[in-house]
């Protein structure tokens, strides 16, 4: 027991000494660290034997005052400044007005006479003899490429004359010299087209949205050197485009073109710039034939027509719903007569060719109206009769047989036969009842053109070679449809290379040539 107690006392003393020594060493270590003699103990090493360095705390950012501080937004009152001066305000108003006036100036019509060089936009110089020839100087949904009329319909035709005409019209083929997507006749969307009356060669005129006039002589042939050989890979790059001419006689949309058959060297064009101009195809000059007295008067013209027996009198309609007449041989002040026929725009009109005192109008107010100039009051004009459609009527086209074809946004083509009702013998003041004004034939046709396609309008052939009257109209499925006056479809013209809707479709007045114009300024020609 004694030994155990002694060891125990000894052990206690030893432990006390160890504790005292450790305390002394710890005190010395702390004193040394505080004086900077030794670095602090390193962190424990990781299991892999590598020590992980401690992240250094980011240095404290000391906010420095900017030598040139950015001024804060403050009101003029807090800055102690006076309100903007009247001079500054007036200057800003003048700059704005100048910009607006410059924009308006681009759209104001030019009343001066133009030479060819002043109108030329692109293409070759026009030559009167080579251009027109010696003989002339004398609601549906569009389904692209889906046909609604074809060979099977022709085979089922029992009427011999109708079948022969269907075969003839369906036999028309696209101009082979160039594909339609190569024939860009105008820079912008085509609004109107017409053929020159010459039968010697197809000569086409097209007016676009910006006042450009395109001219194409389709008798030209592709140069033989440009014909691509099967084994020549580079021939396509050398293939020239057709020779075209582009003029700019107007500052705004050309809405209508007309060539009088007894005056074939003169082309009349009507425009939204409120003017009607005459282009002399021999002299290649353009002069203004009609316009409001002031250039500031904005009266866009929507259509133009002339009586076959009178090459001097112009008839027109406006987007304001007015109808006008002017004998170009007299002064404008005394010879211009106008009638306000509608509160809304008249989109299209035409004269009855054989009795031009009758004319038909199509309006945004959903009406097709028949008028007689012999009994037309300026104060309260009353039509011979009118027919109201479900939606707006785009155009009303008269043919030589006294029939009117209209297109409407209710997706119908309507045909009114006033020839069978004795229109040629009607006396001034004759009127028709609502029942007598109903259409004789209604054809379903998709007329939903939308914003980017020109409105579809029917156009008759002026002098057909057979007793069957016929008209053409664009088809939203990228065709041109041909119908008879009884509503029978005669043809549906298409072909390779037609990449857009040929919305503007026109017949040559006597030959079975048909042209269609697209929103990209390109044309298709069937012959």
UniProtKB/Swiss-Prot annotation:
Residues 52-62 have a biased composition (Basic residues). GO terms for molecular function: DNA binding. Residues 230-241 have a biased composition (Acidic residues). InterPro entries: WD40/YVTN_repeat-like_dom_sf, WD40_repeat_dom_sf, WD40_rpt, WD_repeat_DNA-damage-binding. Keywords: DNA damage, DNA-binding, Repeat, WD repeat. Residues 32-98, 216-247 are annotated as: Disordered. GO terms for biological process: DNA damage response; regulation of DNA damage checkpoint. It holds the Pfam family WD40. WD repeats lie at residues 185-226, 249-289, 296-336, 341-381, 388-427, 450-493, 496-527. The keyword DNA damage applies. It comes from the Eukaryota. GO terms for cellular component: chromatin; cytoplasm; nuclear periphery; nucleus. DNA-binding protein that binds to both single- and double-stranded DNA. Binds preferentially to UV-damaged DNA. May be involved in DNA-metabolic processes. Belongs to the WD repeat DDB2/WDR76 family. This is DNA damage-binding protein cmr1. It comes from Aspergillus fumigatus (strain ATCC MYA-4609 / CBS 101355 / FGSC A1100 / Af293) (Neosartorya fumigata).
């Amino acid at each position: 027991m004694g030994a155990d107690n002694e060891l125990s006392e000894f052990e206690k003393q030893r432990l006390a000494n160890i504790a005292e020594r450790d305390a002394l060493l710890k005190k010395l270590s702390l004193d040394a660290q505080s004086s900077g003699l030794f670095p602090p103990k390193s962190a424990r090493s990781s299991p892999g034997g590598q020590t992980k360095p401690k992240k250094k705390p980011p240095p404290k950012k000391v906010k420095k005052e900017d030598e040139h501080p950015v001024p804060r937004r403050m009101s003029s009152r807090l800055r102690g400044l006076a309100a903007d001066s009247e001079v500054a305000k007036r200057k800003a108003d003048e700059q704005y007005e100048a910009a607006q006036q410059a924009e308006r100036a681009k759209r104001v019509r030019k009343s001066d006479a133009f030479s060819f060089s002043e109108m030329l936009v692109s293409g070759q110089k026009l030559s009167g003899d080579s251009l027109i020839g010696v003989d002339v100087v004398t609601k549906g949904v569009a389904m692209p490429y889906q046909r609604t009329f074809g060979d099977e319909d022709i085979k089922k035709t029992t009427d011999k004359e109708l079948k022969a005409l269907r075969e003839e019209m369906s036999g028309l083929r696209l101009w082979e010299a160039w594909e339609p997507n190569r024939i860009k006749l105008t820079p912008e969307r085509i609004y109107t087209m017409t053929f020159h009356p010459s039968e010697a060669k197809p000569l086409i005129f097209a007016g676009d949205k910006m006042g450009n006039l395109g001219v194409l002589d389709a008798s030209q042939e592709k140069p033989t050197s440009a014909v691509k050989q099967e084994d020549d890979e580079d021939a396509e790059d050398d293939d020239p485009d057709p020779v075209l001419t582009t003029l700019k006689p107007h500052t705004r949309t050309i809405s209508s073109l007309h060539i009088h058959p007894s005056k074939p060297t003169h082309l009349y064009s009507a425009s939204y710039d409120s003017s009607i101009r005459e282009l002399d195809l021999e002299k290649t000059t353009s002069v203004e034939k009609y316009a409001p007295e002031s250039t500031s008067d904005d009266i866009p013209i929507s259509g133009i027509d002339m009586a076959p027996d009178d090459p001097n009198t112009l008839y027109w309609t406006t987007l304001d719903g007015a109808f006008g007449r002017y004998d170009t041989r007299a002064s404008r002040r005394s010879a211009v007569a106008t009638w306000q026929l509608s509160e809304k725009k008249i989109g299209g009109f035409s004269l009855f060719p054989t009795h031009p005192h009758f004319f038909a109008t199509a309006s945004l107010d959903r009406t097709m109206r028949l008028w007689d100039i012999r009994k037309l009051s300026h104060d309260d004009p009353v039509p011979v009769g009118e027919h109201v459609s479900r939606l707006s009527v785009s155009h009303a086209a008269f043919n030589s047989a006294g029939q009117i074809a209209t297109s409407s946004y209710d997706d119908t083509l309507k045909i009114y036969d006033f020839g069978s009702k004795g229109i040629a013998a009607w006396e001034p003041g004759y009127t028709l009842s609502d029942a007598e004004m109903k259409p004789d034939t209604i054809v379903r046709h998709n007329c939903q053109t939308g914003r980017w396609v020109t409105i579809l309008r029917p156009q008759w052939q002026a002098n057909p070679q057979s007793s069957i009257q016929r008209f053409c109209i664009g088809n939203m499925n990228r065709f041109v449809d041909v119908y008879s006056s009884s509503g029978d479809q005669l043809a549906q013209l298409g072909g390779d290379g037609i990449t857009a809707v040929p919305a503007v479709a026109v017949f040559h007045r006597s030959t079975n040539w048909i042209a269609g114009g697209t929103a990209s300024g390109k044309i298709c020609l069937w012959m």
